């Protein structure tokens, strides 16, 4: 957090670095060919069962290849995997024991009812109760 508001306050964590890796973007879904887009560090939060991938690029994690490049050999072995993105990619959906789509505010809000539209042809779902 950078302290912009109460939802974005900085926190201190004691961590152990597990791996320094690359952020990659597969050329196609489930492809082994990729482009390197940035760097990442995978850390373990001390005295917990939590590992976190911190990257300097905003690429969506789509599947195993990207986790491997970040030092996570099998993401399917984790009890819970959280990815901050607006879409659940097929490989993640297929490999997950359970998955949830969370509608959060941000630069690409998925909850369209909260978008402050300026020019709307009425009626328009979900803006209007149809």
Please annotate each region the language model reported.
Residues 1-36:
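Glycine-rich, Lys/Arg-enriched anion-binding loops that position phosphate/diphosphate groups
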Residues 23-130:
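Extended hydrophobic packing segments that form well-structured cores
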